[in-house]
């Protein structure tokens, strides 16, 4: 699977709009990741937890969001994944000031850290693959530039009643040494059945990760995402086609929500 797609799934199933108020200390969202193909109908292969707590960074209060994805025990003999993603978000303006990742996938290891300098419009990134020397880079970003985890929360804040069916918007996603673009289009409202959870009123979006050229989406990665049509606006389902079959992630448990779960229409 495309590594950027796996990053997005973990970040999603692991923001610049201050009025959204979507960071909620104590919120825990748990997901199951499954693989579907002709000979493997809906095989659950991994779990993802996204937790929000309070922390301190630079002497100021921050929301700390930790997204962790691991393969289920039955599949660890085949391929082991234990990935963690973190962001620190200023509680006063909801701007991300730091991102970190710690990735273990089989024999592959990867660590990264992004430090945002919003005043100068740059992000300072450093990363290390396996035992190779650490690399670093400083990149210009716009006000909408962010890491995948912050982008996930920003998409939640963007999913508002202001959207019109067919309308597209674009966000910038920082990935180590480059900036990729995420274009998302509002498909419409849909009642979505989630395994073992029930039926939800949702907002459906079609998303595409562009190339490093910025505005070319012809060979990017596509996925669809369903977000609750209530004030919580958290993803309940994500699906992306791959060469053989598809990968999907769906909510399995949610606790500590800020608002009532009014989108759940039937268990």
Please give the residue ranges for each predicted region.
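Positively charged n-region of N-terminal signal peptides that target proteins for export
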Residues: 1-5
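Active-site/ligand-binding surface loops and adjacent short beta/alpha elements
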Residues: 118-177
């Amino acid at each position: 699977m495309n590594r950027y797609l796996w990053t997005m799934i973990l970040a999603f199933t692991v923001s610049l709009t201050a009025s959204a108020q979507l960071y909620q200390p104590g919120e825990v969202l748990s997901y199951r990741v499954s693989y579907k193909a002709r000979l493997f109908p809906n095989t659950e292969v991994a779990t993802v937890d996204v937790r929000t707590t309070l922390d301190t960074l630079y002497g100021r209060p921050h929301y700390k969001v930790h997204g962790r994805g691991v393969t289920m025990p039955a599949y660890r003999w085949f391929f082991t994944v234990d990935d963690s993603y973190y962001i620190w978000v200023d509680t006063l303006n909801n701007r991300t000031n730091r991102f970190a990742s710690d990735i273990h996938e089989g024999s592959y290891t990867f660590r990264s850290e992004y430090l945002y300098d919003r005043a100068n419009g740059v992000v300072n990134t450093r990363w290390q693959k396996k035992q190779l020397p650490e690399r670093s880079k400083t990149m210009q970003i716009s006000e909408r530039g962010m890491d995948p985890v912050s982008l996930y929360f920003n998409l939640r804040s963007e999913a508002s009643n202001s959207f019109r069916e067919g309308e597209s918007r674009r966000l910038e996603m920082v990935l180590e040494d480059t900036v990729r673009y995420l274009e998302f289009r509002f498909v419409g409202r849909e009642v979505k059945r989630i395994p073992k959870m029930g039926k939800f009123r949702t907002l459906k979006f079609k998303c595409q990760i562009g190339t490093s050229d910025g505005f070319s989406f012809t060979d990017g990665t596509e996925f669809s995402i369903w977000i609750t049509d209530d004030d919580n606006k958290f993803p309940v389902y994500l699906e992306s086609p791959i060469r053989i079959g598809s990968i999907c992630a769906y909510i399995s448990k949610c606790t500590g929500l800020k608002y009532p779960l009014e989108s759940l229409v039937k268990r």
